[in-house]
């Protein structure tokens, strides 16, 4: 009788602990597991875009002939430098290796704009900023809505309002640049 009660207690104990051990194993693999590829790709793409924004912002602050374009460039340099620093920490925490230099696609955009000057630079730079920020808003919104990693999703959500503000500012600056060209 004693042996049966002990065996029964052991079986009940195992039955109670088994679901908890599966839950613990699942949660530890979520924390320590590999970041989903889509989230890692988002981080890498955001880092490249952010570095490009900083580089182009420096060029605009230096080369722009229009004061609004100059100011926009300075703002891009400041805001994207801050976001890049946050993203570097997030990437490090998630085990994502970021390149310290621009890839060919982003470097090509920088090189093309760096060759321009005056009103041509102003126009092409601000056009590029409108296009880039439209694209950024879509990508960040997608990550904020559908990202698999909670920390990456949170960072995208936190950064999104600033990108939307940049887009509005780029669009209003673009209108001003086009209007000044007509006069």
What are these regions, as identified by a protein language model?
Residues 2-13, 17-183:
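His/Met- and acidic-residue-enriched segments that coordinate or traffic transition-metal cofactors
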